[in-house]
Amino acid sequence: MRHYEIMVILDSSLEERTVAPSLDTYLNVIRTAGGSVEKTDVWGRRRLAYEIDKKTEGIYAVIDLQATPAAVAELERQLRLNESVLRTKVIRPEVR
């Protein structure tokens, strides 16, 4: 298992209170593969640095998790298929 950090930018037309439950359904991919979700941090609505699909605002969420590379790849694939997800970024933080 490796440690990953995923940042997701969602469409600002969504209600902020529905963001965490909707992300939780996607995170079941990680749980069924034997991984664990350590923390889900919803930053809320923020202005984008540049327009994405003619949108100037997005809802940011950061997720810390432990998972296999295959499970993270499947999660990223499912997030890309969702129309309300504007961008995703998966990183492996440096070990200190």
Swiss-Prot record:
Q: Name one GO biological process term.
A: translation
Under the GO molecular function aspect, what terms does this record hold?
small ribosomal subunit rRNA binding; structural constituent of ribosome
Which residue positions does the secretion signal occupy?
none
User: What sections of the sequence does the record tag as coiled-coil?
Assistant: none
Asked if RNA-binding is a keyword of the record, the answer is yes
Q: Which domain of life does the protein's organism represent? A: Bacteria
Which InterPro entries does the record associate with it?
A: Ribosomal_bS6 (IPR000529), Ribosomal_bS6_sf (IPR035980), Ribosomal_S6_plastid/chlpt (IPR020814), Transl_elong_EF1B/ribsomal_bS6 (IPR014717)
Cite the SUPFAM superfamilies for this sequence.
Ribosomal protein S6
Q: Which UniProt keywords apply?
A: Ribonucleoprotein, Ribosomal protein, RNA-binding, rRNA-binding
Any single GO CC term annotated in Swiss-Prot or TrEMBL for this entry: ribonucleoprotein complex
List the NCBIfam families hit by this protein, alphabetically.
Answer: S6
Question: What family is reported?
Answer: Belongs to the bacterial ribosomal protein bS6 family.
For this protein, the record's PANTHER family field holds: MITOCHONDRIAL 28S RIBOSOMAL PROTEIN S6, SMALL RIBOSOMAL SUBUNIT PROTEIN BS6M
Function as written in the Swiss-Prot or TrEMBL entry: Binds together with bS18 to 16S ribosomal RNA.
Q: What is this protein called?
A: Small ribosomal subunit protein bS6
Tell me what organism the protein belongs to. Answer: Salinispora arenicola (strain CNS-205)
Gene of this entry: rpsF
